[in-house]
Amino acid sequence: MPETERLILRRWEDCDAESLYEYAKDPAVGPICGWPPHQSVEESREIIRNVFTGKEAYAICLKTDNRAIGAIELKLNGRTDMTEREDECELGYWLGKPFWGQNIMPEAVREILRHAFEDIGMTKVWCGYYEGNTRSWRVQEKAGFRYQWTTREVDVPLMHEKRTGHVSALSKDQWQWDRLYAAAAAVRRERTDSEYITCGEVSAAILSGSGRIYTGVCVDTCSTLGICAERNAIFNMITNGEQVIKKVIAILPDGTSGAPCGACRELMVQLMPHEYRSIEIMMDYKKERVVTMGELTPEWWIG
């Protein structure tokens, strides 16, 4: 069952009908998402029984009382027209108005994306919103979704009208790089420990073979004994019993990303002498330019 610090995402039950009706009857909630306000508790119960039946359809509940305050679903192949692939799905969600502005929906979306990519094997998640639903787009933007296209005159059958629809998507690869960048940025803090030592001007994050993220910052000294951020992240990983590296990102002093230094690349080769070529390096985070260690490191350098 997906959950966060504040939330539980659980299956819908008949007893949720009253709570569902309380929030779904609000005209500020459903129409902008493409469905009319609920008219009765009984209608809400029928929707629980006949609509919220998808394998990955969940009620958003606060842990404090387990009461349904919104809905979120990964619409798998057969329940979406955005993709026909078995390893892709569409994300849909809404939240009761009393809970807007509390960062609840971004929290739920982050967890459902983790669930999609790590638990059920999705490689891409699609999402859409209708023109004017800026709250929905902000949630998608916070989660890392990339704009794909706009379609005009889209049928909205439950509202008996046509609208302009916008579509975005997020791949597993993009999601992993976003998490790595955020992890590296979170530990990057330049500081002076003494007149001879400064730390944190450069930070790095590594995605290990197990899917864990390890971070490190650079340690610069007035001698040649400084340690790179990537190397500290690698040592952190080794200390935790791992040695397989999947992805590496280093954030430079100006906030851009760049390649690991020669010494750090040599360490990665030593750790993975037969597989190092497949390690992915983020060269330009904004432009999403990635190279492999094999492309970055010529054979003569290894030999």
How should these model regions be labeled?
Residues M1-A28, C61-Q176:
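Acyl-donor (CoA/ACP) binding surface of acyl/acetyltransferases
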Residues A28-R49:
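Conserved GNAT-fold acetyl-CoA-binding loop/helix
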Residues I48-A59, G70, I197:
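A short helix-loop-beta-strand connector motif used in the catalytic cores of GNAT acetyltransferases and
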Residues A57-K63, A205, I281-M283:
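Cytosolic beta-strand hydrophobic patch enriched in CBS
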Residues A71, T215-G216, K247:
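Short glycine-/small-residue motifs
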Residues W177-S194, Q243-G303:
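C-terminal binding/interaction regions
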Residues T198, V202-S208:
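Short beta-strand scaffold segments in enzyme catalytic cores
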Residues V217-R231:
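Compact, glycine-rich, soluble single-domain proteins
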